[in-house]
Amino acid sequence: MGSENSALKSYTLRESPFTLPSGLAVYPAILQDGKCASVFVYKRENEDKVNKAAKHLKTLRHPCLLRFLSCTVEADGIHLVTERVQPLEVALETLSPAEVCAGIYDILLALIFLHDRGHLTHNNVCLSSVFVSEDGHWKLGGMETVCQVPQATPEFLRNIQSVRDPASIPPEEMSPEFSGLPESHGHARDAYAFGALVDSLLPIFNEQVSADVLSSFLQILHSALLNPMPECRPALSTLLSHDFFRNDFLEVVNFLKSLTLKSEDEKTEFFKFLLDRVSCLSEELIASRLVPLLLNQLVFAEPVAVKSFLPYLLGPKKENAPGETPCLLSPALFQSRVIPVLLRLFEVHEEHVRMVLLSHIEAYVEHFTQEQLKKVILPQVLLGLRDTSNSIVAITLRSLAVLVSLLGPEVVVGGERTKIFKRTAPSFTKTSDLSPEGSPMHVVCSQQSRVSKVLEDPSSNVFPKWLSGNVPSSSRKRIQEECYSSLSQTGDQFSHTIKFPMNGLSDVKNTSEDNGSFPAGSNKPEEWPDWSEPEEPEQQPASIHRWPREPCDVAESQHTNLTAEEVTWDDGEASFGTEINSTATASAPVPVTSGGQSTSAALVPLTEESKPLQSSPSSKTSHRQHEEVKPPQVSQERPLKAPSGLGLGEEFTIQVKKKPVQDPELDWFADMIPEIKPSGTFLILPELRTEVMVPDKDNVSSLMQFSSKFAATEMTEGEAEGWEGEELAWEDNNW
C-alpha cells in the first residue's frame, strides 16, 4: 500500500473516459513502469468522499475489492489511481454465463468480507459499483459510500443519496419512521441491494442453468433477499452452498484459489479428473480465467498435474492428430493468452518450474517471436548449463537442440564453426563380379580373391609342409613369397601385370612387351635384412657377382632344379624424373660331373658406367653336402635424367622378358631323394618389387630392367636346405 504509493511517480491518461451514472469519469492509464491502471477523476468539491474512499481502499485488502494504487490532486480534480479495471456495464455484453456466475460469486465474497471481517456496510451495491479486472474477476468499488453499521444513520444515507442507485435502496428507508438498522441486521441493506443486482442478471442464465436450480435460486432471491422486512433477510454467507454456484468452472476456480489449503488426497483427486471437467468449458473461458491459475509454481509442483493435465495446456491444438487427446486451446488463443504467462515463468528460477517448461518446449517454442527467443528464452535456458543439478543440465542440452532449428547454430552455439565431420556413405557390401568368365577382368578378380584368402589365413595348407621344419626364417619367407606369387598367376590366358598405386602414383603403364610371356605378379616387397651395412658412396658403379656352386654328385645334380619367379620392380616415388634401364643376361647353370668342377659366369653390363661382372671361386666347406655363398656387394650410381617424353612413373618401370616355364612347385616334390639345393642369389632393391629369373636347362636368358636411383642396395640370398638332421655351415667372407 505505502510502497505502491511511493513507487508511483507519474502516469499517462489514455483514450476517452467512461462516465458512470454518478458523474464519475474513469480513464484508462499507463504507469511509468509500463503497467496498466485506471484513474477515477473526482470533482474538487468531493474531496471528503475521495479521502474516505482512498482510506477504505488502503485498509481493506481482498481479491474481490478494487486495489488501490495512489491518490493525487490535479488541476482538473482529484485522481484516484487503481488497478486496470473496466466497468461492468461495458464488459457485461462480452461475458459468458459461467463468467457472470463467477462474477456474482466474487461480489458475494466481497460483501461477506465487509460484513464479517470489517463490520462494514457498503450501502451502494449496484451495477455501477462493480468492475471487471483484466483477469476476469469482478471487483467491488464505490468505496466512498462505505461506513460502519452504527454510522449508517438516516442523515448519512441522505448525504450519499446522490451517488446511490435507486434500485439498490431498500423499502424500509422510504418510511419516514426509519431510524436505522440494528447492528445485528446491519447486513440487511446490502443483502437487498445484492438481490436486486442478481435479479437483473438472471436472464443471462436461461439456457445455461437447469430450470430446477434457476427456479430455486429465484425463490431464495425474492423470498429472502428481497423481503420487505429487514429482519427476514438472511446473511449472505448462506448463499455460498447453493447449487447455483456449483458448476465446473466455479469449482475449479475456487479449488485453485485455495490450493495451499487442500490435502494431498484432495489435490490428487482434483488434478486426476481436471481435464474432463475443463474440456466442457469454452476455450475463451479457459484462456482468460483458468490459464493464470493453472500455470504457476504451485500447480507445477504437483506431480499428478504435471503428468495428467499440463501436457494438454502447454501446447496448442493440432489439426492432424488422430487418436490423440487434443489440447485445450487453439493456436490463436494459445499465442495471446499462454505465451505471455510462459515468458514470465521462464524468469522464475525454481527447479521444478524449469523442468516442466523444458520438458514440453517442443510443443510451444514455435509460438515465440524471434525477439522473445533471443532476449528472453535463450538466455534463461543457457542458465541451466551452469546449474549443479544433473537433470537440469541434461534437459537444458536437449532444449538447446530444439532452439538450434529456430535460431540457428550461430546464435545458440556462438563463435566460428569448422567442418569436422565429413559426409560419407560407407558401403558394407562387396561388389559382385558380374564380368564374363573368360574376360581379363574376371581373371583379375579371381586372382585377387585367391591371393586375399591366402593373405588372410597364412596358416592354411597352401605352403608345403616341409616349410614347417627347421628351415631358416629368411628362406621360409622367400619360399612363402614365391607361393604367393604363383597363386596370382593363371597361365598364358592373361599376360597383363596387375599394378597397384605406389605412394599415391597410379600412372604406371603395362611393361609387358611379349604377349606370350608369363605375367609378372604384384608381389609384396621383401623386408630388409636385419644386418646393417655402411652406406656406400653414390658414385660407385653397380656390379653383380655370381658365385658358382660346389660340385655335387651326379644324382644330386640331375634332380636339382633351382627355380625362381619373375617379379616386376616398380619404383613408387615420382620425385625423380630419371630412369636407367639396365639389362643383364644370366647364363644357365652348367652341369657339374664327378670328375671335376667348372665355373661359368656371364659378365653383363648393368649400366653404361657399370663394371663387368666378376666371378671368383668359392672355398669348399669341410662337409661334402654344404656349400657357401658369399653375399655380393651391389652399388648403384646416381640416376641420370631420362628424356622428358616419358609419362609420369614410366622411368621407374622394369621390363622383364622370359619364356613361360612350368610351375616351380612341381619340382619341389619331384622325388624323395635327399638333395641339397644350391643357393640362388637374388638382387633385392629397396622399395621395389622383385622378380627372380628362373633359369631352365636350355640356358634361357632374361632381360631385367631396374632403376638405380639408390646409392646402396642390399642382397638377399637363397638358402639351401636338405633332409632333416643335415646341417649347413655358413661362413661370412669378404664383408
From Swiss-Prot:
Region called Disordered, residue ranges: 505-545, 604-648
Entry keyword Cytoplasm: yes
InterPro entries in the record: ARM-like, ARM-type_fold, CIK-Related_Protein, Kinase-like_dom_sf, Prot_kinase_dom
GO MF annotation list: ATP binding; identical protein binding; protein kinase activity
Cellular component annotations (GO), alphabetically ordered: cytosol; endoplasmic reticulum; Golgi apparatus; Golgi membrane; lamellipodium
Compartments (UniProt record): Cytoplasm; Golgi apparatus; Cell projection, Lamellipodium
Predominant place of localization: cytoplasm
Record region (Interaction with EZR): 547-735
HEAT repeats (start-end): 194-249, 285-323, 333-370, 372-409
Keyword Transcription regulation included in the entry's annotation: no
Lipidated sites in chain (N-myristoyl glycine): G2
Alphabetically ordered keywords of this record: Cell projection, Cytoplasm, Golgi apparatus, Lipoprotein, Myristate, Phosphoprotein, Repeat
Modification(s) after translation: May be myristoylated; myristoylation may target it to Golgi compartment.
Residues annotated as domain Protein kinase: 2-245
Composition bias type Acidic residues, residue spans: 528-538
SUPFAM superfamilies: ARM repeat (SSF48371), Protein kinase-like (PK-like) (SSF56112)
BP terms from Gene Ontology: inflammatory response; neuron development; protein localization; spinal cord motor neuron differentiation
Phosphoserine modifications at: S439, S701
Record remark on domains: The protein kinase domain is predicted to be catalytically inactive.
Similarity annotation: Belongs to the protein kinase superfamily.
Oligomeric and partner information: Interacts with EZR/VIL2 C-terminal domain.
Function of the molecule: May play a role in regulating cell adhesion/migration complexes in migrating cells.
Protein name: Protein-associating with the carboxyl-terminal domain of ezrin
Native organism: Mus musculus
Gene responsible for this protein: Scyl3
